[in-house]
C-alpha cells in the first residue's frame, strides 16, 4: 500500500517544481514520462544504448567504420590532397616532406607552410627556419616527419590507416599497368593534335631518345591499340600526322597526359598524374606554328609571302626576313642591322592561335603611319591595356625595354619557348626522381641503392616499355613503316635545329 503514497508524493513534487510544464496545454502526461525517462538508465544492448554509443563516438570525433576506407584507400582523394600543395604554399622542403608523403597521412595545405588534416581538422606548422647548422636542420626535418603522424587528434584514423605507398610511386613492378597507362596518356595527347608543343632536338639528345627507341614505342602503341576492343578503337580515333604521334609518344613516356578536367573549355592543357602539375601549352611554341615556319623556310623571297594555302586563316603570315620568321615579333630591337629593311610598310605579323586565346590585347594592329613611328609591340606583361593601337616614338631606350619584356614573357620563339618534358615536372615528382627498388621500399629506405644505376622514373619506365616490346616482338617483324615515319619526323627536327642556328 506504500506504492500509491509514493506515487502521489512524486506527482505532488512534480507539480510543485514543474508547475508551468504540468499546466501546459500540450501533452502533459508525455512531458512527465519524458522527465522520468531522463533519470533512468537504459538496459544494456537496447536500442537506446546503441544510439547513445553512436552519439558519444560522434561527439568524441571517433571515425565511422566506412571513413578510413573511403579516405585512405581512395586514389582520387589522395591526389586531390596532393593538388593542394602548390609552389607558393609548399616550397623548399626535403624529399621526406614531399606532398606525396604529407598526403599519405591525410594532410592538405591551407596557407604557406601550414598543413590541415582532412579528417580531424588538426593544424600543423611545417616551417623550416634558415639555419647554418646542418644537424639542426636535419633534426627539424625529422621532427616534422614524425609530426605527420603524431599531430592528428586522438581519435583520428590517419596515423593507423595511411594511404598505400603505391599511390605515390610508379608501378615499375607491373609492366602491364605501365603499358596500359602509357597508351591512355598517348591517346589523350593525340586529341590535342597540332596544339602539342614543339620539342627541341637538343633535349631529345640529352634524353637519349633515338629514332629506334621511338619506333619501338610506336610499334608497342600500335600493338596495344590492336588488342583493345572494337568499341574502344572506334571511340579513340587518332590523327594521321606522324609528327603528332611522335610528340605525343615522347610526352606520354615522361608522364604527361591531356587534362580532362578543363576539356569543355577547349584549353590546350596537359597535366602530370603524379605531381598534379598543369601546364598551359599556349606559353610554348606549338607544332602548328612550327610547321608554318618550316614550310615558309623553303619558300623565302625578297618580298612578303601571303598566307599559306590550306592553312587556317588564324595562322600568322610569313614575314620577309628569316630572322623575323623565327622571332615572330613586331619589334626588331634584337637586330638593329635589319631594322632599316623592315621599316617599310608591310603586313603586321600576328601571334599564333595560342597567344590569341591567352591575352586580350594580342590582335593585329594598324600599320605604321610613318617610318619614324611604329606600332607598340604586344607583350603578355602589358595586361589589358588600350585596345586601340598606340603610336610611340621609336627611341632606343623604349626599344631596349620592349625587347626585355618580350624575351621575359615566354615568347614562343625564344629558347625557353620549347617544351622540356622533364624539367616541367616538380622536383619531387616520381617521374624525374631516382626510383627506389622494391626491396628498398619494403625496408622503408629513402636512399637509392648504390649498386644499382640511378635513373629517373621516366627513364626506368622507358626501359621497361622497350623490354616489354622486345620480349613480345616476333623474330621476323616488318618494322619499316613506323620506323621510316619516325625518321622523317626526326629529319624535320634537324631542319628546325638548322633554322634555329641561323
UniProtKB/Swiss-Prot annotation:
Residues 50-72, 351-360 have a biased composition (Polar residues). A motif (Nuclear localization signal) lies at residues 396-402. It is found in: Nucleus; Nucleus envelope. The modification Phosphoserine is found at residues 24, 58, 62, 321, 329, 338, 344, 354, 359, 370, 381, 395, 407, 483. GO terms for cellular component: nuclear envelope. The modification N-acetylalanine is found at residue 2. The lineage of its organism: Eukaryota, Metazoa, Chordata, Craniata, Vertebrata. Keywords: Acetylation, Cell cycle, Cell division, Metal-binding, Mitosis, Nucleus, Phosphoprotein, Ubl conjugation pathway, Zinc, Zinc-finger. Residues 371-380, 407-422 have a biased composition (Low complexity). This is Zinc finger C3HC-type protein 1.
Amino acid at each position: 500500500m506504500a506504492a500509491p503514497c509514493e506515487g502521489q508524493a512524486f506527482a505532488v513534487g512534480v507539480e510543485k517544481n514543474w508547475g508551468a510544464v504540468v499546466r501546459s496545454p500540450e501533452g502533459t502526461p508525455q512531458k512527465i514520462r519524458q522527465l522520468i525517462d531522463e533519470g533512468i538508465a537504459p538496459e544494456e544492448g537496447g536500442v537506446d544504448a546503441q544510439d547513445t554509443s553512436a552519439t558519444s563516438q560522434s561527439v568524441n570525433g571517433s571515425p565511422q567504420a566506412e571513413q578510413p576506407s573511403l579516405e585512405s584507400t581512395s586514389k582520387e582523394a589522395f591526389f586531390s590532397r596532393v593538388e593542394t600543395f602548390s609552389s607558393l604554399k609548399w616550397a623548399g622542403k626535403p624529399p621526406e616532406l614531399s606532398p606525396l608523403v604529407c598526403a599519405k597521412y591525410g594532410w592538405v595545405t591551407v596557407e604557406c607552410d601550414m598543413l590541415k588534416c582532412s579528417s580531424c581538422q588538426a593544424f600543423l606548422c611545417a616551417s623550416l627556419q634558415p639555419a647554418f647548422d646542418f644537424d639542426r636542420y636535419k633534426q627539424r626535418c625529422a621532427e616534422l616527419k614524425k609530426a605527420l603522424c603524431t599531430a592528428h587528434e586522438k581519435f583520428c584514423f590517419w596515423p593507423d590507416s595511411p594511404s598505400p605507398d603505391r599511390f605515390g610511386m610508379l608501378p615499375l613492378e607491373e609492366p602491364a599497368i605501365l603499358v596500359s597507362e602509357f597508351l591512355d596518356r598517348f591517346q589523350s595527347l593525340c586529341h590535342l593534335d597540332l596544339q602539342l608543343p614543339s620539342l627541341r632536338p637538343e633535349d631529345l639528345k640529352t634524353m637519349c631518345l633515338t629514332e629506334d627507341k621511338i619506333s619501338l614505342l610506336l610499334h608497342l602503341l600500335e600493338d596495344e591499340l590492336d588488342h583493345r576492343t572494337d568499341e574502344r578503337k572506334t571511340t579513340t580515333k587518332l590523327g594521321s600526322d606522324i609528327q603528332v604521334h611522335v610528340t605525343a609518344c615522347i610526352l606520354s613516356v615522361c608522364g604527361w597526359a591531356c587534362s580532362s578536367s578543363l576539356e569543355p573549355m577547349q584549353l590546350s592543357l596537359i597535366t602530370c598524374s603524379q605531381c598534379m602539375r598543369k601546364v598551359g601549352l599556349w606559353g610554348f611554341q606549338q607544332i602548328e606554328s612550327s610547321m608554318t615556319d618550316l614550310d615558309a623556310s623553303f619558300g623565302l623571297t625578297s618580298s612578303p609571302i601571303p598566307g599559306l594555302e590550306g592553312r587556317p586563316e588564324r595562322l600568322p603570315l610569313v614575314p620577309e626576313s628569316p630572322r623575323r620568321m623565327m622571332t615572330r615579333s613586331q619589334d626588331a630591337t634584337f637586330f638593329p642591322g635589319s631594322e632599316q629593311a623592315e621599316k617599310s610598310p608591310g603586313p603586321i605579323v600576328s601571334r599564333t592561335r595560342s597567344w590569341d586565346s591567352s591575352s586580350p590585347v594580342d590582335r593585329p594592329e594598324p600599320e605604321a603611319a610613318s617610318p619614324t613611328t611604329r606600332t607598340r609591340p604586344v607583350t603578355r606583361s602589358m595586361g589589358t591595356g588600350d585596345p586601340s593601337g598606340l603610336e610611340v616614338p621609336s627611341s632606343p631606350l623604349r626599344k631596349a625595354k620592349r625587347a626585355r619584356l618580350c624575351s621575359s614573357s615566354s615568347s614562343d620563339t625564344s629558347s625557353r619557348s620549347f617544351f622540356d618534358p622533364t624539367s616541367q615536372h616538380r622536383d619531387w615528382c616520381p617521374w624525374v626522381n631516382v626510383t627506389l627498388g622494391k626491396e628498398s621500399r619494403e625496408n622503408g629506405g629513402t636512399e637509392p641503392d648504390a649498386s644499382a644505376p640511378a635513373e629517373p622514373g621516366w627513364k626506368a619506365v622507358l626501359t621497361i616499355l622497350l623490354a616489354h616490346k622486345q620480349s613480345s616482338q616476333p623474330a621476323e617483324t616488318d618494322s619499316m613503316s613506323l620506323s621510316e615515319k619516325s625518321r622523317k619526323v626526326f629529319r624535320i627536327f634537324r631542319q628546325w635545329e638548322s633554322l634555329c642556328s641561323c
